[in-house]
Amino acid sequence: MKDVLTKLANANHLRFEEMQQAARELFAEDVTDSEIAAFLIALKAKGETAEELAGLASIMREVAVDIPVSGTDFIDNCGTGGDGSQSFNISTTAAFVLAGAGAKVAKHGNRSVSSKTGSADVLESLGVPLDVSTEEIATLLETNGIAFLFAQRMHPRVKQIMKVRRDLRIPTIFNLIGPLTNPVPLKTQLLGIYREDLLETIALTLHRLGRKRAIVLHGACGMDEASLAGTNQLVLLDQGELIRFSLHPEEVGLSVAPIEAIRGGTAAENAEILLRVLRGEAGPYRDTVLLNAGIALFAEGRVETIREGIERSAESIDSGRALEKLQYLQRMKQQEAIG
């Protein structure tokens, strides 16, 4: 680890293989908290490359639990966090909308680290069980079209690193890495990031990790989700080709709204917002979910345009299918209680 830290301190990039070796040392039982902290801070100061991100993500996936699924026709939608927007859980809400529209969503997430409420926190508040087995996850993906993969259970080797991250209280490479380490083999991904300068880097990383299609976006006002507040920046990865474009909500039939209109709160408050959206309540919360779900459906290739994706997302909510996907997961908890 000393050689790696020296190289990073001198602002030298690591090759893919060097990062893989550094990752193996990072996940070793004898690594110290100070070594982890030094690695995270040095890498953040230098700036992450696609090779470094892919190298670390590949080892995290290598040491993750195995999910016994067949095929690769799965999508994940998530943000990196770290944008400081204090918004509600947009991607978690949108995940149920995607499933209601026919996508198979392997929703990979965690408790809050650098934000107020993580996806695991809000789902737990809704009564969705987090401690499901890998076999149950595979079954849920097949029968319900959506399953939640609790990152702490998927990546047991990262427990010590999570502790250091919480102590640091700043965004690190693991904000970027988390969304890249889904143990389910994904065909498509929608990934929102808090740093516009990393759009192409993350898209190249996804290509290196085998994604066929993906969209990486940076929202208006610095959000890690597509925003109604103004123009959003996106990069489409399509079979290895990168296409950058911008998107304003009015271009796809949605009204502009400030980020203050989608503020979240505690896990319980965000759970209530999620339910209001899935039950059909109109307003900026719903429109933000429609925008993000519509982009994800376009990324997947399920629709030809983002506007069409928004229409399909609205149908998913208004038909009740999105809410049914959540209720299916909630019933698992009830069945556990009954025994």
Curated annotation (Swiss-Prot):
<keyword id="KW-0479">Metal-binding</keyword>
<dbReference type="Pfam" id="PF00591">
    <property type="entry name" value="Glycos_transf_3"/>
</dbReference>
<feature type="binding site">
    <location>
        <begin position="89"/>
        <end position="92"/>
    </location>
    <ligand>
        <name>5-phospho-alpha-D-ribose 1-diphosphate</name>
    </ligand>
</feature>
<comment type="similarity">
    <text>Belongs to the anthranilate phosphoribosyltransferase family.</text>
</comment>
<feature type="binding site">
    <location>
        <position position="225"/>
    </location>
    <ligand>
        <name>Mg(2+) 1</name>
    </ligand>
</feature>
<feature type="binding site">
    <location>
        <position position="165"/>
    </location>
    <ligand>
        <name>anthranilate 2</name>
    </ligand>
</feature>
<keyword id="KW-0822">Tryptophan biosynthesis</keyword>
<feature type="binding site">
    <location>
        <position position="224"/>
    </location>
    <ligand>
        <name>Mg(2+) 2</name>
    </ligand>
</feature>
<keyword id="KW-0057">Aromatic amino acid biosynthesis</keyword>
<dbReference type="InterPro" id="IPR000312">
    <property type="entry name" value="Glycosyl_Trfase_fam3"/>
</dbReference>
<dbReference type="InterPro" id="IPR035902">
    <property type="entry name" value="Nuc_phospho_transferase"/>
</dbReference>
<dbReference type="GO" id="GO:0000287">
    <property type="term" value="F:magnesium ion binding"/>
</dbReference>
<keyword id="KW-0808">Transferase</keyword>
<feature type="binding site">
    <location>
        <position position="225"/>
    </location>
    <ligand>
        <name>Mg(2+) 2</name>
    </ligand>
</feature>
<feature type="binding site">
    <location>
        <begin position="107"/>
        <end position="115"/>
    </location>
    <ligand>
        <name>5-phospho-alpha-D-ribose 1-diphosphate</name>
    </ligand>
</feature>
<dbReference type="InterPro" id="IPR036320">
    <property type="entry name" value="Glycosyl_Trfase_fam3_N_dom_sf"/>
</dbReference>
<keyword id="KW-0028">Amino-acid biosynthesis</keyword>
<feature type="binding site">
    <location>
        <begin position="82"/>
        <end position="83"/>
    </location>
    <ligand>
        <name>5-phospho-alpha-D-ribose 1-diphosphate</name>
    </ligand>
</feature>
<dbReference type="GO" id="GO:0000162">
    <property type="term" value="P:L-tryptophan biosynthetic process"/>
</dbReference>
<protein>
    <recommendedName>
        <fullName>Anthranilate phosphoribosyltransferase</fullName>
        <ecNumber>2.4.2.18</ecNumber>
    </recommendedName>
</protein>
<feature type="binding site">
    <location>
        <position position="110"/>
    </location>
    <ligand>
        <name>anthranilate 1</name>
    </ligand>
</feature>
<dbReference type="Pfam" id="PF02885">
    <property type="entry name" value="Glycos_trans_3N"/>
</dbReference>
<keyword id="KW-0328">Glycosyltransferase</keyword>
<dbReference type="InterPro" id="IPR005940">
    <property type="entry name" value="Anthranilate_Pribosyl_Tfrase"/>
</dbReference>
<dbReference type="GO" id="GO:0005829">
    <property type="term" value="C:cytosol"/>
</dbReference>
<dbReference type="GO" id="GO:0004048">
    <property type="term" value="F:anthranilate phosphoribosyltransferase activity"/>
</dbReference>
<feature type="binding site">
    <location>
        <position position="87"/>
    </location>
    <ligand>
        <name>5-phospho-alpha-D-ribose 1-diphosphate</name>
    </ligand>
</feature>
<feature type="binding site">
    <location>
        <position position="79"/>
    </location>
    <ligand>
        <name>5-phospho-alpha-D-ribose 1-diphosphate</name>
    </ligand>
</feature>
<feature type="binding site">
    <location>
        <position position="79"/>
    </location>
    <ligand>
        <name>anthranilate 1</name>
    </ligand>
</feature>
<keyword id="KW-0460">Magnesium</keyword>
<feature type="binding site">
    <location>
        <position position="119"/>
    </location>
    <ligand>
        <name>5-phospho-alpha-D-ribose 1-diphosphate</name>
    </ligand>
</feature>
<comment type="subunit">
    <text>Homodimer.</text>
</comment>
<comment type="function">
    <text>Catalyzes the transfer of the phosphoribosyl group of 5-phosphorylribose-1-pyrophosphate (PRPP) to anthranilate to yield N-(5'-phosphoribosyl)-anthranilate (PRA).</text>
</comment>
<dbReference type="InterPro" id="IPR017459">
    <property type="entry name" value="Glycosyl_Trfase_fam3_N_dom"/>
</dbReference>
<feature type="binding site">
    <location>
        <position position="91"/>
    </location>
    <ligand>
        <name>Mg(2+) 1</name>
    </ligand>
</feature>
<comment type="pathway">
    <text>Amino-acid biosynthesis; L-tryptophan biosynthesis; L-tryptophan from chorismate: step 2/5.</text>
</comment>
